[in-house]
Amino acid sequence: MNIHEYQAKAVLQPFGVSLSKGVAILKATDAEAAAKQLGGPIWVVKSQIHAGGRGKGKFKEASAGDKGGVRLAKSIEEVKQYAAEMLGATLVTIQTGPAGKQVNRLYIEDGSDIEKEFYLSLLVDRVTSRISFVVSTEGGMNIEDVAHDTPEKIISFSVDPATGIMGHHGRTVAKALGLTGDLAKQAERLVAQLYAAFISKDMEMLEINPLVVTKQGELKCLDAKMSFDGNALYRHPDISALRDETEEDAKEIEASKYDLNYVTLDGTIGCMVNGAGLAMATMDIIKLYGMTPANFLDVGGGANKEKVTAAFKIITADPNVKGILINIFGGIMKCDIIAEGVVAAVKDVGLKVPLVVRLEGTNVEAGKKIIQESGLNVLSADDLDDAAQKIVKAVKEAA
């Protein structure tokens, strides 16, 4: 689960992390009061969306102006102007895709007198089963570009969970960033604070970009990006309460209600598969035959008729879907259950696009019989290769 920047900073505050003061607003009419509360004389008006690259992003609407999603204001009037322009407008960044995201919240923050910018993040390293720090002197930039162009400027290390964070970890960060004296001590404290927050809240990722040194000699987190382990949210009702469903895909939200693993993609062939590995293989073979998947959907091994019906409805709710491929290998999941769910869903919502079903495994003959006797216009496939070719051909012919 992701949260907004202003929420992430609120999570970090109790751990003693050095942050700028800020006020979140939902209405442009609240901008003046927020600016006066902070005092100025410089403010930063930040779009709050679940995507990076806000500063370099562009708004779709001409009324939002030609500046990005993070703007420096030198007067209260500018704060009011930017708030009016940005709220409700659609911001397109390198991470949102061409559709962009609507800005429904702003974070108005005290401006900082910046001397240097750095990058610092913590993430779960699944190879070592440890938390890793990633540090770079190239802050305020897209870290993927830095990793590609100048990998030598990125330093990373992991923390042994048996010992936890230790003094040498902070010194490693300070050395990597070229910090000495009091700034090095601040870096040591910050590393311990961020690690404590990461562990305490079951985070998957914590990114500070940029981490800055101000001209007053203070090490400060100017931005904060967080994601949390969804499997641990039951332990953190305070974090769960921060969820902003307007930032999430409506189909993914609906899928989560049925414990379906669903991810929206930008293709045209909807997929329903059991098992993540088989789902990825199905997506790959669709791509191999010249088309792209519209989603990743793993119904899991214990799906029932209602769950399958819900999955089918979610797929058909996507207007980009021009064909559907159902690929089931019945182990724990029984093919007749899948067939019953598909037939029920088709009769309920109708079938306006080609549908190919490949069933194999437990109760496969019963499953095929249910589909055959349903009278539905469904293409049957014997194996994955056959299924992929049939759905691609059917979609092209229907176009």
From Swiss-Prot:
Essential cofactor(s): Mg(2+)
Enzyme Commission no: 6.2.1.5
Catalytic activity as recorded in UniProt: succinate + ATP + CoA = succinyl-CoA + ADP + phosphate; GTP + succinate + CoA = succinyl-CoA + GDP + phosphate
Entry binding sites for Mg(2+): N209, D223
A Gene Ontology molecular function term of the record: succinate-CoA ligase (ADP-forming) activity
One of the Pfam families matching this protein, by short name: Ligase_CoA
One BP term from GO: tricarboxylic acid cycle
Pathway(s) it belongs to: Carbohydrate metabolism; tricarboxylic acid cycle; succinate from succinyl-CoA (ligase route): step 1/1
Keywords: ATP-binding, Ligase, Magnesium, Metal-binding, Nucleotide-binding, Tricarboxylic acid cycle
Cofactor note as given: Binds 1 Mg(2+) ion per subunit.
Residues annotated to bind ATP: K46, G53, R54, G55, E109, S112, E117
Domain ATP-grasp: 9-254
UniProt-annotated binding residues for substrate: N274, G331, I332, M333
Entry GO terms, CC: cytosol; succinate-CoA ligase complex
Similarity comment text for this entry: Belongs to the succinate/malate CoA ligase beta subunit family.
Subunit text: Heterotetramer of two alpha and two beta subunits.
PANTHER family, per the entry: SUCCINATE--COA LIGASE [GDP-FORMING] SUBUNIT BETA, MITOCHONDRIAL, SUCCINYL-COA SYNTHETASE BETA CHAIN
General function of this protein: Succinyl-CoA synthetase functions in the citric acid cycle (TCA), coupling the hydrolysis of succinyl-CoA to the synthesis of either ATP or GTP and thus represents the only step of substrate-level phosphorylation in the TCA. The beta subunit provides nucleotide specificity of the enzyme and binds the substrate succinate, while the binding sites for coenzyme A and phosphate are found in the alpha subunit.
Protein's recorded name: Succinate--CoA ligase [ADP-forming] subunit beta
Source organism per UniProt: Rhodopseudomonas palustris (strain BisB18)
Upper classification of the organism: Bacteria, Pseudomonadati, Pseudomonadota, Alphaproteobacteria, Hyphomicrobiales
Encoding gene, per UniProt annotation: sucC
